Amino acid sequence: DRIKEGIEDESPSLSFINNLNLTYNLTKADKYVFNAIFRNNLSNAPYQNELNKMWAAGSTESIYSYVNNHTSSYSPALDLYFQHTLPHQQSIQVNVTGTLIHTKNNRKYKEYKDENAPLADIQTLVDGDKRSVIGEAIYEKNFKEVKLSDGVRHYQMRTENEYKGSNPTTSKMDQSQTSAFFEVQGKVKDFSYAGSVGMTRAWFKESEEEHAYYTFTPTVRLSYNLKKAGFLRYRFNISPAIPSLGSLTDVEQAMDTIQIVRGNPLLKTYQQFTNSLSYSYSKKQFNANLSVRHQYYDNPIMESIFVEDGKLILKDENQRSFQSLNAELMVGINGATLFGLKDFLTLYASGGYTRSWSEGLNYSHMYDEFYYSVMAQVQYKDFSLLGQFRKVQNNFFGETIKKNENQTAFMAMYTRRNLQAGIGIMFPFTNNYKVGKERISEVAPFRSETFVRETGQMVVLRMGYTFEFGRKHKAGNKGLNNSDTDSGIINMQR
């Protein structure tokens, strides 16, 4: 057994993200909407470092490990959308999105007693290119009491990733997802209903490995207007989850001297079953909502960790099941009159509880989580003061818990006509912003925490002014939105 203990790293942790979008919209009311967006997403994270002290169980002799990770990507995308209103209460929507993703990942790992004489030096260089096209079309027809819809969607992608360094290899993968559906919506007095049936085909190919999977995707939505007593809603649906290309790739890369990340081209698409029930009530400024949701994943793709030839292998596999049960209550008042001041106070509070069960091929875990939030805002004429606290819910899946920092913020704002100015503070009671990750595996338990001192007591300044001139154009809304952000590179952040 080897024990690893993190050491505070004084080196900077930098991340640059730039999103540059060019949008064109042409709308003729009740006739058509054409929208074109040219997106350019650039990211660069040059200093993602990690320093650790390590020793064998029962030994006092230690060594050090250091990880330097530099990732960058550039992703241009062209998103075209067209909506046309046809005679006899008909309409059609079409969306086509093409995306290129170029990714570079340079990861260096060293073990040493003397930094100038490393005991191990592992380097992983990944140069990845991905091309994808997403096309979707929906037709709708309205009758007096019923609305009919049908549609198709196709997602085609190809990646070419070159892995250099200590374990060089090249991966070329093709993947597609095709789906079609038919839906009926209607209303009978205070009762509304919607039902749809659909089918999804997922396909994957790498070298001689090729798979195709089919998933039935029904949806049921029911709602009942209780009038003065509130509103009741129910929803059930089955949706497919296809493996990511990064998990499917037939590649293995060493994280360090004992851990290896391995792809799995045998991964299968799995089904997600969701049931949700909610009750909402509102009267004047008072609002309340109670919701319950149950999710069940059949043979989900989750992590597996096992020992092979003295090494720890980290690999995604189709496990037995994952399910979660969530209940959440929200109550609030919006724009209440107080001390004779109209629309002076807005106050919301919410709380929830989630229990999750993760059933792997060789593990079984249960995880409980409480979370809550409180928000208050007072407004007088052009001035407003906002305060918020959130105990953020952690994310649990497989054998990993991703932990989030609680969030506190205060903001003072002044708004007049086109001018908006404000000053605020985030995390006023936090010296170190902390996020973490814990792996509760019996084979290889792991816990890490990342601190960012600069985030504590962070002052925020906000200034905005809206310029208006010339003729005003009311842009039509975009009814379909598709995008691709998966680079297809094997995940080394475990």
Regions found by a protein language model. Give the residues of each.
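Feature captures outer-membrane beta-barrel proteins of Gram-negative bacteria and organelles
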Residues: 180-186, 216-224, 275, 279, ...
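Outer-membrane beta-barrel translocator domains and adjoining extracellular loop/strand segments
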Residues: 1-2, 45-59, 105-113, 160-169, ...
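Outer-membrane beta-barrel signature, preferentially recognizing the C-terminal barrel domain
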Residues: 211, 230, 240-289, 296, ...
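Face-selective signature of the C-terminal outer-membrane beta-barrel domain
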Residues: 15-45, 66-209, 225, 289-294, ...
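C-terminal beta-signal and adjacent terminal beta-strands/loops
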Residues: 416-494
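C-terminal beta-barrel architecture of Gram-negative outer-membrane proteins
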Residues: 351-358, 370-415, 420, 424-447
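Gram-negative outer-membrane beta-barrel transporters
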Residues: 294-297, 301, 316-395
